[in-house]
Regions:
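Hydrophobic alpha-helical segments
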Residues: 56, 146-149, 173
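Short regulatory helix/loop adjacent to the ATP-binding pocket of P-loop NTPases
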Residues: 168-175
Length: 175
């Protein structure tokens, strides 16, 4: 099982690790991935799709604050800021490399997958995104996020690893 997961990590496709409770799903993930290779989002049963997307952005390094502008649905947009390290060679008399920190400010609609993809691309984010306990999300949120996964796959190089308790092999595909 370990080798099969490692092989699939190199395929640029989303991965689901599923099964019944207490079967070693999280242990498998921890065993096969280095901590620096992923961000971990622990799902909650109280989250909406926007909450899930906000948590992904926060774990990716964004600071989120509510904006005064609204989406076409009348919901408040979010102002997102991320620190970008720019390494410059040469620099001062010491001859070493210098690092400049710049902040990128974006205005996002957390329910728009295109905004989320754009923000992660803007931050030059390349880690795996692990969604642990995906089954805790409401069915509607699971369905909506399964649809977003298609956009993430087609419009970015981002790879999600979804860990959850269910027995249906096609759980996310049927959406």
């Amino acid at each position: 099982v370990d080798e099969r997961l490692r092989c699939n990590l190199n395929r640029d496709k989303h991965i689901t690790i599923f099964g019944s409770s207490k079967q070693g799903k999280t242990c498998l993930r921890k065993h096969c991935l280095n901590k620096n290779d992923y961000i971990l989002v622990q799902c909650s049963n109280r989250w909406s799709l926007s909450d899930l997307n906000a948590n992904i952005l926060k774990r990716a390094g964004y600071e989120l604050t509510e904006s005064t502008n609204v989406t076409y649905e009348g919901k408040a947009k979010v102002s997102a800021s991320v620190k970008i390290l720019d390494a410059t060679l040469g620099g001062e008399a010491g001859g070493g490399a210098t690092k400049n920190v710049t902040h990128r400010q974006l205005e996002l609609d957390l329910s728009d997958v295109n905004d989320i993809i754009g923000a992660l691309n803007e931050a030059d984010f390349h880690q795996y995104i692990v969604l642990e306990d995906f089954h805790y999300l409401k069915s509607e949120v699971q369905k909506d996020f399964a649809i977003e996964l298609k956009a993430f796959h087609e419009s970015s190089k981002l790879c999600f690893i979804i860990v959850g308790v269910w027995l249906d092999e096609n759980k996310l595909v049927i959406y």
